A protein has these predicted regions:
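Charge-rich, low-complexity N-terminal segments
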Residues: 1-2, 6-7
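Charged, low-complexity intrinsically disordered segments
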Residues: 39-40, 69, 89, 93-103
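Short Cys/His-centered divalent metal-binding micro-motifs
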Residues: 59-87
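Short flanking/linker segments adjacent to small metal-binding domains or redox-active Cys/His motifs
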Residues: 97-153
Length: 153
């Protein structure tokens, strides 16, 4: 990336901390897994971070599988992708084909989840199943029209 990254302000740090400690990995949640070990992914468009001075507000939570492609112990890459979906390292188009566009689908779903947290906070690393179901249903409604392959939990 060219240029200097702006410093994270208090509300930026609070957003990233809430994602890491309270929300977990968004793709894992969408696949039905509640993951607690989360890194922060800054959303990019054509290799550049979006948002300008507000780029820390354009973030989503990803686990080490979805962010870096690191497999769990004794799992193959095929098993991981079958259970959790493809990682971002396999290519943005493959990742977005499975989970939806980062700019138009995943960031709004992450913001929806953060709004749910602001409305009714939950303890660290203890995401309620009702919240997970609500977020997943919101993602399904944004990602694709209903089809016979769309399964709501």
């Amino acid at each position: 990336m060219v240029g200097q990254t702006p410093r994270a302000r208090k509300n930026d740090r609070q957003r990233m901390d809430t994602i890491a400690k309270h929300c977990g990995c968004l793709p894992c949640l969408l696949m039905g897994h509640l993951d607690i070990h989360t890194t922060i992914e800054h959303v990019t468009d054509c290799g550049r971070r979006v948002g300008g001075d507000e780029q820390h507000q354009w973030t989503i939570g990803l686990c080490v599988w979805h962010h870096f492609g690191h497999v769990h112990n004794h799992w193959s890459r095929q098993q991981m992708s079958g259970e959790f979906g493809p990682p971002l390292t396999w290519g943005r188009s493959i990742f977005e084909e499975h989970f939806g566009d980062e700019l138009t689908i995943l960031v709004p779903v992450q913001n929806f989840m953060l709004a749910e947290f602001d409305r009714q906070p939950w303890p660290e690393y203890a995401l309620h199943r009702e919240v997970a179901r609500t977020v997943r249903n919101h993602w399904i409604s944004k990602n694709a029209p209903p089809s016979r392959y769309t399964v709501q939990s």
